[in-house]
Amino acid sequence: YHTTILPFTRLIGGPMDYTPGIFEMDCSKMNPGNTSRVRSTLARQLALYVTMYSPLQMAADVPENYERFMDAFQFIKDVPVDWDESKYLEAEPGEYITIARRAKGTGDWYMGCTAGYNGHESDLKLDFLTPGKKYEATIYADAKDAHWETNPQAYTITTKKVTSKSRLKLKA
């Protein structure tokens, strides 16, 4: 996937124009006769709001598609567009990237993890968090049966208490 390469090419010099947030991957739903698909899942589209630094953000899909998934759309409403701090937790260009970013003017952290064709499993230390502080992580992830081609809108939302001593397992 090109989204695991862009952070090492176009994003090297600073922010870029990138518009994630597509919730309907089947292009024929809006344009009959167009059989192409967006090679992504809904949860991956959310992760791109964090992994792709683009401080002028918008929602890329039509309102009707967001109305079907309001719990996932909440992330788009909440995610900041500018950051005070960014940490590249792990990366292999063309394979995977996991980034943690601290929202501008707050202590709120956001993580995004995305992978190429082979997927990726992470076991991440959260030692960048403020020691002694407790956080509630809201995790938007692909469901077990999610696949960009057959089930791109299968996702889960879970919450978990974490601290700077916690580890977080992610699958992209």
Residue ranges and their predicted role:
Residues Y1-P63, E90-A91:
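Glycan-recognition surfaces
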Residues D17, A47-M52, I99, Y110-C113, ...:
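Structured core elements
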Residues Y18-T19, Q57-M70, I76, W83-K87, ...:
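Acidic/polar loop patches that form or flank catalytic/metal-binding clefts of enzymes
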Residues Y66-A72, Y117-N118, D127-D145:
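Active/binding-pocket-proximal capping segment
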Residues F73-A103:
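Edge strands and adjacent loops of beta-rich recognition modules
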Residues P93-P131, Y135:
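Carbohydrate-binding surface patches
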Residues T138-K160:
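Acidic, Ser/Thr/Pro-rich beta/coil linker or hinge segments at domain junctions
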Residues T158-A172:
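C-terminal beta-strand-rich structural cap/linker in extracellular carbohydrate-active enzymes
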